[in-house]
Regions:
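Conserved hydrophobic beta-strand positions in leucine-rich repeat
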Residues: 11-15, 32-37, 54-59, 76-81, ...
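Intrinsically disordered, low-complexity regulatory regions enriched in Ser/Pro/Gly/Thr
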Residues: 4-8, 27-29, 49-50, 71-72, ...
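A generic tandem-repeat structural signature
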Residues: 38, 43-132, 137-139, 148
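LRR N-terminal entry segment and analogous cap-like coil->beta motifs
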Residues: 2-46, 51-56
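Canonical leucine-rich repeat
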Residues: 23-26, 45-48, 67-70, 89-92, ...
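Leucine-rich repeat domain C-terminal region
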Residues: 209-215, 219-292
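Eukaryotic tandem repeat interaction scaffolds
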Residues: 131-231
Length: 292
């Protein structure tokens, strides 16, 4: 590793891809607000307790096995330990100011030990081994929750998250849309690549602007006439065969994008024309913009 000279006055320190194997020598940083140690060879979180001014810590893509030694960084607002080898969520109890937490692509099997993070606005736990949505009922300020590419079988334990505007649970093992009745502020819902068979359970989600239920097992577009704020509707790779189903979207006057490819509907030689006639506000059908 080359010798790194640090400016004690620096507020933003970026040591991305420096082949750093050990966190050391950073106590000289008296004013540091953001410390980026992405893509290094760090195995252990250590020697950071002096950095009381730190607001953002980025440890993305290292070899870290455990969240530890962060107790002193009580002012931390953004923490990214994605693409490491973490097995547990732990060691965060003192980080009560944390607003964004990224733990993507680790080996985490359980959501736990987050109850003190009541300022948290964004939680990203995609690409882990999580089987259940649990232990998040104290996170009432949460705005965005990302749980894609896990092993979740049921939509549950979301009732307390009334401020949630973005929920992403793509590529899991869901079979039913449920448990969303309290999420009245939800604007974006991503449920693609699951085993969902029926569109249901969205009665209270009137503010939805984006609904992605692509790559499921849905035979009918139904129960969404009340979603009049909808701007994007992703329904490709399902089993839709009846053109009259598009009537469900007629009230969505702001609808601009629909994905319906790889449904039985697409076999119709008038496929694009029929969508344009049924949904005149649409500007994009599948990946192609509408020509006028």
């Amino acid at each position: 590793m080359e010798t790194i000279s640090l400016d004690p006055e620096a507020e933003d320190v970026d040591l991305n891809h420096f082949r750093i194997g050990k966190i050391e020598g950073f106590e000289v940083l008296k004013k540091v607000k953001t410390l980026c140690l992405r893509q290094n060879l760090i195995k252990c979180i250590e020697n950071l307790q002096q950095l009381q001014t730190l607001k953002e810590l980025d440890l993305y893509d290292n070899q870290i096995r455990k969240i530890e030694n962060l107790e002193a960084l009580t002012g931390l607002e953004i923490l990214d330990i994605s693409f490491n080898i973490l097995r547990n969520i732990e060691g965060l109890d003192q980080l009560t100011q944390l607003k964004k937490l990224f733990l993507v692509n680790n080996k985490i099997s359980k959501i736990e030990n987050l109850s003190n993070l009541q300022q948290l606005q964004m939680l990203e736990l995609g690409s882990n081994r999580i089987r259940a949505i649990q232990n998040i009922d104290t996170l009432t300020n949460l705005d965005s929750l990302f749980l894609g590419k896990n092993k979740i079988t049921k939509l549950q334990n979301l009732d307390a998250l009334t401020n949630l505007t973005v929920l992403s649970i793509q590529s899991n093992r869901l079979t039913k849309i449920e448990g969303l009745q309290n999420l009245v502020n939800l604007r974006e819902l991503y449920l693609s690549h699951n085993g969902i068979e029926v569109i249901e359970g969205l009665e209270n989600n009137n503010k939805l602007t984006m609904l992605d239920i692509a790559a499921n097992r849905i035979k009918k577009i139904e129960n969404i006439t009340h979603l009049i704020e909808l701007q994007e509707f992703w329904m490709n790779d399902n089993l839709i065969e009846c053109w009259s189903d598009l009537d469900e979207l007629k009230g969505a006057k702001k609808l601009e994008t629909v994905y319906l490819e790889r449904n039985p509907l697409q076999k119709d030689p008038q496929y694009r024309r029929k969508i344009m006639l049924a949904l005149p506000s649409v500007r994009q059908i599948d990946a192609t913009f509408v020509r006028f």
